UniProtKB/Swiss-Prot annotation:
Lineage: Bacteria, Bacillati, Actinomycetota, Actinomycetes, Streptosporangiales
Database matches in InterPro entries: IspD (IPR001228), IspD/TarI (IPR034683), IspD/TarI_cytidylyltransf_bact (IPR050088), Nucleotide-diphossugar_trans (IPR029044)
Family of the protein in this entry: Belongs to the IspD/TarI cytidylyltransferase family. IspD subfamily.
PANTHER family: 2-C-METHYL-D-ERYTHRITOL 4-PHOSPHATE CYTIDYLYLTRANSFERASE, CHLOROPLASTIC
Coiled-coil intervals, chain numbering: none
Pfam families associated with the record: IspD
Site (described: Positions MEP for the nucleophilic attack): 170, 229
Stated name of the protein: 2-C-methyl-D-erythritol 4-phosphate cytidylyltransferase
CDD domains: CDP-ME_synthetase
Reactions catalysed, as given in the entry: 2-C-methyl-D-erythritol 4-phosphate + CTP + H(+) = 4-CDP-2-C-methyl-D-erythritol + diphosphate
Alphabetical keyword list: Isoprene biosynthesis, Nucleotidyltransferase, Transferase
Pathway: Isoprenoid biosynthesis; isopentenyl diphosphate biosynthesis via DXP pathway; isopentenyl diphosphate from 1-deoxy-D-xylulose 5-phosphate: step 2/6
Length: 249
């Protein structure tokens, strides 16, 4: 894969906000990305962060199909000028990522795509910039932070209950965040191979590259603890506190 660009232009950068989930763990009848966080929906905050990044040329929103019209209304009222289209998501995370890829099929293979969870509304401009910068050298990047907790691997005993099988070295472990960034040629090839495999499923785009393009290095960008994923009701309270105290913007 060549990372060289024609001298007359830099790579175009598209960012896709993945908002196809239903947020069942939030215990809400509404998708979590449409819940309000300090006066704005979670979706708006994620979209606004990517729109504010000077490196990003275009933002695509991949939305839960049942709430597509609601998302269109919310984002139209917010005047997010970089949002070019809002498309329906798939039944799985990988299908929503594929929808994002299809939405930028007019981009060249050397252009860039950032895939970001809508449920991470506190992503910083520094993190977005770092992803784009690293993609001048490699074809895939993932944002991650060191684990402050010990992580164990479990198995089931004879009674069907979990027991510890191994304790991996914490120094070598990272907790993945988003955005995850790619040269479009890399992520296109990875997903083409993945979807050719019967029963393919994935929850992480870097993992798709790692599995289906093992020769392609996936570089780590050090993330920020404030870039939390709003999954449970308590996460919403934490996000509100981070905004209130100025730890996140």
């Amino acid at each position: 894969m060549s990372l060289d660009q024609p001298a007359h232009r830099r790579p175009r950068v598209a960012a896709a906000v993945l908002a196809g989930g239903v947020g069942s763990r939030m215990g809400s009848a509404h998708p979590k990305q449409l819940l309000r966080l300090a006066g704005q929906t979670i979706l708006e905050r994620s979209v606004a962060a990517l729109c504010a990044a000077p490196e990003v040329d275009e933002v695509v929103v991949v939305m839960n199909a049942a709430h597509l019209a609601e998302a269109e209304k919310i984002l139209a009222e917010g005047r997010y000028d970089k949002v070019s289209r809002i498309v329906p998501g798939g039944a799985s995370r990988s299908e929503s990522s594929l929808a994002a890829l299809q939405a930028v099929d007019d981009y060249d293979d050397n252009d860039l795509l950032l895939l970001h969870d809508a449920a991470r509304p506190l992503v910083s401009g520094r993190t977005i910039t770092a992803c784009v910068t690293e993609l001048t050298e490699v074809g895939a990047v993932g944002v991650a932070v060191p684990s402050s907790d010990t992580v164990v691997q479990v198995t089931l005993d004879a009674s069907g209950r979990e027991v510890i099988a191994a304790v991996p070295d914490r120094a070598a472990l990272r907790r993945m965040q988003t955005p995850q960034g790619f040269r479009l040629g890399v992520i296109r090839r990875a997903y083409a191979r993945a979807f050719a495999e019967p029963g393919f499923t994935a929850t992480d785009d870097c993992g798709v590259v790692l599995r289906y393009l093992p020769e392609e290095p996936v570089r780590i960008v050090t993330g920020e603890e404030s870039n939390i994923k709003v999954t449970h009701p308590s996460d919403l309270a934490v996000a509100e506190a981070l905004l209130r105290t100025g730890v996140a913007q």
